[in-house]
Swiss-Prot record:
Organism: Mycoplasma capricolum subsp. capricolum (strain California kid / ATCC 27343 / NCTC 10154)
Protein name per Swiss-Prot or TrEMBL: GTPase Obg
Gene field: obg
Subunit structure: Monomer.
Boundaries of every OBG-type G domain copy: 160-332
One GO CC term, this protein: cytoplasm
Key word Transport present: no
Length: 433
């Protein structure tokens, strides 16, 4: 399957069903009362973690997802059926962003985790709901509310306990094969690994953890060079970083230290908190004579003396048990501190509960000239959408709700006169006061 780790989507929840206007018609009941039922609620859009999925390819191919609209109410106080919800299954490790604000809406980090992203509109009330002592035969009804609609970005960040990072050809893929049942492509040229590879490692004590071989980094990766951002984002989910270094570098200690600092600087530039992650420096290819000679250099000894270092040969599987033991010990410590605590100062990676703040928008009044006015705003739109002026009672209710907002008072203060016209979205109404 093609590995796709990001997709842009439009999701739309269902509209609520309209309330019904009807009256009882029965033998011997000549003046039956109102019995219009309420509309059903629109379906909502959910995302659900699915450990059987490993790519966002499905989302890339289908970019629009909609839940079903609610059904309208009916006679005899019959309630309209609710619209069917839409559940979109994504790989565990998917993060959903609001494209407009770039804030995190949800972190789907567990199998079967169900997250509500777009809520369906509430069904409108039927005329039976509006009967009272003053109006025993109302023709008032509510239209169903619109469902929420959003543009979102889905990103898949590999969920692994440990991430292998390093320059191309550091031997990460060979090491992954040595410690797990994974079979990544291995060859003697840069960028053999172009997608994250996962494997399950097992210690001598049968303790297991998940390892990700992350594609080789180059200088400037934090700025997006090479396949920079595409790879670096996967490291954010790893609790322990294993920095794999080719110890057989042609330029000895200078090569080893330079390569280490290059990768460290890229991690730091991309996300300051990556610098705080538990790190193990893995000096690889120790089966080669050049590597043995390089590590005799005092520069290397002094530079790494206060760091956690292990010497191994991924190809010959030498010292692998010690590496696995060190990783597992670091993991036990790291797992006591949640990942978002490590990143609590990083706004980019803040864990946010999906929540859309309702926009508070002032009512707007425009004098268009030639005896024409226009009113707009979120509050006005909600009234316009909720009370279609298809019946006389709804027109009266529409006017009453607008009056309650204070917009009529504003129009008077601005100089509206009898006979002027007021545009309210698709409606154009004559001012009669």
């Amino acid at each position: 399957m093609k590995f796709v780790d990001s997709a842009d989507l439009i999701i739309k929840a269902g509209k609520g069903g309209d309330g019904a206007v009807s009256f009882l018609h029965a033998l011997f009941v000549p003046n039956g009362g109102p019995n219009g039922g309420d509309g059903g609620d629109g379906g909502s859009v959910y995302f659900q973690g699915d450990e059987g999925k490993h790519s966002l390819l499905d989302l890339k191919l289908q970019k629009k997802y909609s839940a079903q609209d609610g059904f309208k109410g009916d006679i005899k106080n019959m309630h309209g059926a609710n619209g069917e919800d839409k559940i979109i299954k994504v790989p565990v490790g998917t993060i959903l962003y609001d494209k407009k604000t770039n804030t995190i809406l949800a972190d789907i980090n567990e199998n079967n985790k169900l997250v509500l992203i777009a809520k369906g509109g509430k069904g409108g009330k039927g005329n039976a709901r509006f009967a009272n002592s003053r109006n025993k035969a109302p023709t008032i009804f509510e239209a169903g509310e619109l469902g929420q609609e959003f543009e979102i970005r889905a990103e898949l960040k590999v969920l692994a306990d440990v991430g292998f990072v390093g320059l191309p050809n550091a031997g990460k893929s060979t090491l992954l094969r040595a410690i797990s049942n994974s079979k990544p492509v291995v060859a003697d040229y840069p960028f053999t690994t172009i997608n994250p590879q996962l494997g399950v490692a097992r210690t001598k004590n049968n303790d297991t953890f998940i390892v990700a071989d992350l594609p080789g980094l180059i200088q400037g990766a934090s700025l997006g060079k090479g396949l920079g951002h595409q790879f670096l984002k996967h490291i954010e989910r790893c609790l322990v970083i294993c920095h794999i270094i080719d110890a057989s570098g042609n330029f000895g200690s200078e090569d080893i230290i330079k390569n280490y600092e290059l990768i460290r600087n890229e991690l730091k530039a991309y996300n300051l908190n990556l610098e705080k992650r538990a790190e193990i420096i893995v000096l690889n290819k120790m089966d080669l004579d050049e590597a043995q000679l390089n590590l005799l250099d005092e520069k290397i000894i002094n530079y790494f003396k206060n760091k956690k270092v292990v010497q191994i040969s991924g190809l010959k599987k030498e010292n692998i048990d010690q590496l696995l033991f060190m990783i597992y010990e670091e993991l036990k410590i790291a797992k006591k501190q949640p990942l978002w605590e490590l990143d609590k100062n990083n706004d980019q990676d803040e864990i946010a509960i999906y929540k859309f703040e309702e926009q508070k928008e002032d009512i707007q009044v425009y004098n268009k000239g030639n005896n024409r006015w226009e009113i707009a705003g979120e509050t006005i739109f909600k009234i316009y959408q909720k009370f279609p002026i298809w019946t006389e009672d709804n027109l009266l209710m529409f006017n009453e709700k607008l009056k309650e907002t204070g917009v009529y008072e504003t129009l008077v203060k601005k100089g509206i006169k009898k006979g002027d016209f007021v545009k309210v979205f698709d409606y154009e109404l004559e001012w009669t006061d």
